[in-house]
Amino acid sequence: MTQPGRLTEVFDKCRAEERAALIGYLPNGYPDLDTSIELMTTLVRGGCDIIEVGIAYSDPMMDGPMIAAAAETALANGVRVADVFTTVRAITDAGGHAVVMSYWNPVLRYGVDAFARELAAAGGLGIITPDLIPDEADDWIAASDAHDLDRIFLVAPSSTPERLERTIGACRGFVYAASTMGVTGARDAVSNAAPALVSRVREVSDIAVGVGLGVRSGAQAAEIAAYADGVIVGSALVAAAPQGPAAVRSLAEELATGVRRA
């Protein structure tokens, strides 16, 4: 049995409703801080079970052009790393479940323990760390244990059996399965590597598996929800963000319907 995490009850609730969890990502501070907070609380009302609050970073090597451009806009408009705690608090106050998604450098510069402490105080439940591997995560593992935060590492189709098992063993809450190789972004077709990757995870653990990188419609959400515990949507929501809260809510509701009809 996997060690239960803060997000375990969210996935348990979704399983009880015989559906996958909907996990929505938006970059903090895009297009500006106040608007991003409004958009993320809109995701809660639109049916997202977990909100990923992205920290804008100047070298987003794993992001597609849509998210990279949004991060650039957020940074140009003055968003700071510490602003993420304000956003997480707003999501929590709206009844949502918030995790942070960040490259490791901003957290490292802030101070790993200080970041974890403030995130927990704001109601945050964990951090997704796309460019951090468990072998190099001693400080984060210690801080997450100290402040009761979930650790979400990434696995990919290219992960060796040993790497997969080690990564899953270090996760708490859920594991992020990257369904396509390379950078993220909305695609017309969802990778057929994803079901095989989810099966590999389930061979070694009962931890919840969230699949991301490519979903942009309710139909695609339903496709992934048929075999995954969580459906992660990022670029499509970022694309809707400039159109305002109504557009973001409409897409969230479509996706929420999708994860319920798998």
UniProtKB/Swiss-Prot annotation:
Keyword Amino-acid biosynthesis attached: yes
Gene Ontology CC entries for this record: cytosol
Location of the active site: 52, 63
Domain of life assignment: Bacteria
EC number: 4.2.1.20
Gene Ontology molecular functions: tryptophan synthase activity
Keyword field contains Amino-acid biosynthesis: yes
Signal peptide stretch: none
Pfam family membership, one: Trp_syntA
Task of the protein: The alpha subunit is responsible for the aldol cleavage of indoleglycerol phosphate to indole and glyceraldehyde 3-phosphate.
Subunit structure of this chain's protein: Tetramer of two alpha and two beta chains.
Protein name: Tryptophan synthase alpha chain
Organism: Mycobacteroides abscessus (strain ATCC 19977 / DSM 44196 / CCUG 20993 / CIP 104536 / JCM 13569 / NCTC 13031 / TMC 1543 / L948)
Lineage: Bacteria, Bacillati, Actinomycetota, Actinomycetes, Mycobacteriales
